[in-house]
């Protein structure tokens, strides 16, 4: 079934969220007859419910399209649909490494957005040929000429012959297919008789077939019955089936050079298949290994605890299942005095955290509490050693720490001019350092250096509310810098609550401590004794609120009578309250944790 190399095109679609990339993929599949009308549904490549609901792509998907071009030749087009969100940039990087060209989809009414830039630069770094596609051309607000000029000014690629389409109505889709055939290059190199060399693009778990591995063959032929070897891990597996997605799974006899397809080989766990690894034949291995791309490193950490302690084992099982499909999600067990048993989890960013939490709650029917998200700090100890700190509650004694370094990001924000002042003020409040400000038509593009710690809480939400949803934001990690950071503990009735401790910059500690104490005062119910809520840095209290005691009227039964009798009862009540305060436990309701942790700087 191997196709001649010059008739294969491997391409991906690069776009900002909501610019219509999955809809364009739907139209391409429909036009090339990948699915008939009955099987067609919107966003056919977004297979998770959560992807459809939020209108975002999380897992990169692939599909093989057969197209008869206007020149009468038959072509095989391998499309990889990539996510647009910054958290899933590693999905984008592996998709781009398997292609030679990209379609850059830009909304003709909105123009270039921050994540368009991030992903298109990745494509340029991979030496991709880029075809510009202007989508939503049917909207009254569409300004194709302005957007073309913007693409040339901001990205620096020629957009004069951009394909103008409407993915929704199907207008111009044929022109996109012709542009793919005529402008994008065919796969390079590839010798059918050379030893097998293939790149592992992705892998996911299927309950019937085990692990399905998506591969891009570079040299040699991959077919059923071969014993393959993963060059990175040295593991060997017999190939059980080879096939392609149309987007239905279709088995084929073999996969030749330049082709994209899947294999199953009785692999039990996704962790055994490292993305970017080189696959070769065990009997006749290849000499040179492909330069794999770097695995995704977790950036944001938080604790996940079941609301009901009895669900702990279910949560462990659910996380194991999610880990099968998402190698970038990591977790380890932890215990908290306030919340019981749970897990410390690592994520690629806040959207990733939200999606994992939502999938756990939805697919496995679990009720969860998440602790405050934190980033990875580096501690330089006085004895010359270095440590990584994932959980503020585990911070060693301040005396042993020489300095603390925190991760900084380079953030690119694109916004209409009207909101520029408010956004710059927000970045300044978050300790941002302005690097650059340029204008592209009526939109401003600002570049800031920001501490990641200030972004993980609610920066994105605040940015969207300040700009009424018009600003777009993209970031990448730049480096670690020393900061004046302190651990803030929250004490309830003079007992520290580990789930609420956090590392904050000294300048913001008092403000955040006061806000958290005020919030907890509203959320913790009154007890029979007075409860102090304090925010402390080391031994110093920086904020305090007091929940007053419930008062039982102990003198109600004294009808008139001697005042000393009343005083005796009141004194007795006072004594027992004092004792209660000493030994009584404050019950902090689960809702209080959830609400307090949702709190930003508002």
UniProtKB/Swiss-Prot annotation:
Keywords: Cell inner membrane, Cell membrane, GTP-binding, Hydrolase, Membrane, Nucleotide-binding, Protein biosynthesis. GTP binds at residues 18-23, 135-138. One of its GO terms (cellular component) is plasma membrane. It catalyses: GTP + H2O = GDP + phosphate + H(+). It comes from the Bacteria. Its EC number is 3.6.5.n1. GO terms for molecular function: GTP binding; GTPase activity; guanosine tetraphosphate binding; ribosome binding; translation elongation factor activity. One of its GO terms (biological process) is positive regulation of translation. Belongs to the TRAFAC class translation factor GTPase superfamily. Classic translation factor GTPase family. LepA subfamily. This is Elongation factor 4. It comes from Brucella abortus (strain 2308).
């Amino acid at each position: 079934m191997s196709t001649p190399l010059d008739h294969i095109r491997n391409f991906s679609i690069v776009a900002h969220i909501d610019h219509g990339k999955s809809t364009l993929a739907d139209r391409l599949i429909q036009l090339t007859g990948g699915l008939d009308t009955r099987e067609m549904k919107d966003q056919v490549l977004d297979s998770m419910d959560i992807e459809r609901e939020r209108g975002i792509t999380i897992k990169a998907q692939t599909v093989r399209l057969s197209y008869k071009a206007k020149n009468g030749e038959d072509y095989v087009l391998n499309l990889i649909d990539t996510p647009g969100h910054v958290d899933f940039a590693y999905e984008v990087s592996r998709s781009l490494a398997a292609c030679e060209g990209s379609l850059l989809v830009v909304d003709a009414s909105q123009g270039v957005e921050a994540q368009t830039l991030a992903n298109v630069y990745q494509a340029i770094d991979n030496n991709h040929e880029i075809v510009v596609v202007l989508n939503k051309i049917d909207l009254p607000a569409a300004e194709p000429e302005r957007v073309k000029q913007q693409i040339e000014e901001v990205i620096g690629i020629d957009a004069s012959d951009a394909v103008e389409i409407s993915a929704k109505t199907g207008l111009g889709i044929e022109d996109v297919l012709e542009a793919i055939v005529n402008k994008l290059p065919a796969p390079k190199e590839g010798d059918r008789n050379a030893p097998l060399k293939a790149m592992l693009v992705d892998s996911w778990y299927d309950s019937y077939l085990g692990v399905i591995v998506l591969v891009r063959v570079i040299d040699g032929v991959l077919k059923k019955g071969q014993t393959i070897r993963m060059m990175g891990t040295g593991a060997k597996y017999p190939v059980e089936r080879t096939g392609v997605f149309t987007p239905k799974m279709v088995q084929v006899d073999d996969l030749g050079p330049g082709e994209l397809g899947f294999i199953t080989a009785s692999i039990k766990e996704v962790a055994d298949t490292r993305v970017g690894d080189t696959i070769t034949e065990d009997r006749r291995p290849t000499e040179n290994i492909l330069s794999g791309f770097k695995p995704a490193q977790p950036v944001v950490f938080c604790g996940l605890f079941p609301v009901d302690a009895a669900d702990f084992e279910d949560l462990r099982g659910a996380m194991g299942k999610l880990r099968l499909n998402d190698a970038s999600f990591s977790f380890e067990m932890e215990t908290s005095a306030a919340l019981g048993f749970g897990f410390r989890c690592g994520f690629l960013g806040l959207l990733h955290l939200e999606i994992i939490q939502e999938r756990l709650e939805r697919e496995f029917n679990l009720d969860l509490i998440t602790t405050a998200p934190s980033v990875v700090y580096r501690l330089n100890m006085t004895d010359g050693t270095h440590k990584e700190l994932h959980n503020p509650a585990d911070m060693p004694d301040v005396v042993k720490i020489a300095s603390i370094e925190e991760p900084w990001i380079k953030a690119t924000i694109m916004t209409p001019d009207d909101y520029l002042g408010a956004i710059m003020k927000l970045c300044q409040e978050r300790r941002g350092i302005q690097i650059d400000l340029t204008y592209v038509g009526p939109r401003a593009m600002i570049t800031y250096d920001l501490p990641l710690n200030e972004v993980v809480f609610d920066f994105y939400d605040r940015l969207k509310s300040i700009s009424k949803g018009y600003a777009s934001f993209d970031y990448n990690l730049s480096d670690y810098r020393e900061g004046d950071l302190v651990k803030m503990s929250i004490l309830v009735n003079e007992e520290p609550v580990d789930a609420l401790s956090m590392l904050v910059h000294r300048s913001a500690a008092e403000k955040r401590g006061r806000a958290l104490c005020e919030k907890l005062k509203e959320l913790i119910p009154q007890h029979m004794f007075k409860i102090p809520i304090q925010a402390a840095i080391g031994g110093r209290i920086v904020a305090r609120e007091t929940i007053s005691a419930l008062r039982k009227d102990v003198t109600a039964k004294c009808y008139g009578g001697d005042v000393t009798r009343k005083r005796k009862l009141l004194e007795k009540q006072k004594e027992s309250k004092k004792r209660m305060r000493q030994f009584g436990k404050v019950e902090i309701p689960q809702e209080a944790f959830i609400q307090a942790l949702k709190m930003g700087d508002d």
